[in-house]
């Protein structure tokens, strides 16, 4: 109604190098009224309308989470956004073949999971950063997330929608270990080359399990350990299955401490090769957090004091990284350790991680304000 709700003075200008523009900051934090507003600056004009309220991020959150559903592989999906319908029938129902595991022409079920990208491949290492962050979101915001409705097919009855979506991926991950019970986990499941820009149901070339890698196996351990503790209230038997799979793969890694990359060979799809030090660290952290067993705590604390080897970025002796992604999950390990309520952590290491969390946060804030 054009009534003034708040007035003040902007500060600036401040040059932003990333966009090569001068910007002014309008701080209206004291405004506590909810509703739709606009800024009117004399000599400049009127801004677009914006909303102040408790639920302003709901649309962004639900849209992002619905995106995971639309990335599902092995089932029909359908959604509408801004009046446009997005849908495809079930795809990749022949996943996958074991030719590169020494069993030419043999097919083993590995349907499900999320497509990684437009090539529709499914990658264990890439799943790690995604599943890990989603479970951590549940750790921090369970009281809100358990009430969220994402309008999903009920593929895991009794689970909250948020966890149902994660379980679609963990169901697939449980199909990625070698069938010999060794605990080795295939690095990925893809075609030998990229598919091109086609709909997923038209991608009908054979897709293969690749050889195992230690990074994929360690990430599998971490994800299964997290699944075991977060899914236990909803399905204790499934949680135990996840934990046993994690134990088996962890034992294999302990018996084979050397880094193992998978052989890319005939494959031209994403390699996603990764040093495994951060992955093994994360595996130890999640196994300890889930079980409380001291051998996992010992493994974590021994690894946590070793200077990290990074895929890229500057070397550092700090415990927390500013830049992290699928190829560096070290922060996930550190956060699990520092936020745990379990007893027995090493006071000096705990203090070092806490201090580095704060100093890294301070640097990021300073960079944002620069």
Describe each model-derived feature in a short phrase:
Residues 1-7, 12-21, 30-49, 57-370:
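Glycan-recognition and catalytic cores of secretory/periplasmic carbohydrate-active enzymes
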Residues 23-25:
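Intrinsic-disorder/low-complexity, polar/charged segments enriched in Ser/Thr/Lys/Arg/Asp/Glu/Gln
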């Amino acid at each position: 109604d054009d009534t003034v709700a708040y007035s003040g003075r902007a500060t600036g200008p401040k040059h932003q190098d990333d966009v090569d523009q001068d910007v002014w900051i309008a701080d209206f934090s004291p405004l506590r009224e909810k509703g739709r507003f606009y800024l009117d600056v004399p000599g400049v004009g009127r801004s677009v309308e914006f909303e102040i309220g408790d639920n302003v991020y709901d649309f962004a959150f639900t849209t992002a989470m619905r995106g995971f559903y639309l990335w599902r592989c092995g089932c029909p999906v359908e959604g509408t956004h801004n009046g446009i319908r997005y849908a495809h029938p079930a795809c990749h129902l022949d996943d996958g073949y074991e030719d590169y595991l020494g069993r030419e022409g043999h097919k083993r079920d590995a349907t499900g999971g999320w497509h990684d990208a437009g090539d529709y491949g499914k990658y264990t290492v890439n799943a790690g950063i995604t599943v890990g962050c989603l479970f951590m979101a549940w750790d921090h915001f369970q009281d809100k997330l358990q009430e969220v409705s994402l309008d999903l097919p009920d593929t895991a009855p009794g689970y909250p929608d948020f966890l149902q979506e994660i379980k679609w991926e963990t169901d697939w991950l449980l199909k990625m270990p070698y069938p010999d019970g060794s605990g080795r986990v295939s690095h990925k499941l893809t075609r030998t080359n990229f598919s091109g820009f086609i709909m997923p149901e038209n991608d009908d070339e054979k897709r293969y399990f690749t050889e195992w890698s230690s990074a994929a196996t360690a990430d599998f351990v971490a994800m299964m350990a997290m699944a075991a503790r977060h899914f236990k209230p909803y399905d204790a038997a499934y949680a135990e299955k996840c934990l046993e799979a994690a134990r088996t793969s962890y034992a294999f890694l302990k018996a084979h401490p050397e880094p193992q990359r998978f052989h890319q060979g005939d494959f031209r799809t994403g390699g996603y090769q990764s040093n495994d030090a951060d992955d093994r660290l994360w595996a130890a952290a999640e196994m300890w957090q889930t079980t409380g067993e001291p051998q996992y705590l010992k493994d974590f604390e021994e690894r946590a004091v070793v200077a990290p080897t990074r895929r890229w970025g500057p070397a550092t002796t700090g415990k927390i990284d500013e830049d992290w992604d699928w190829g560096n999950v070290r922060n996930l390990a550190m956060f699990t350790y520092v936020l745990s309520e379990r007893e027995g952590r090493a006071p000096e290491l705990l203090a070092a991680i806490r201090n580095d969390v704060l100093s890294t946060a301070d640097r990021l804030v300073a960079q944002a304000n620069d």
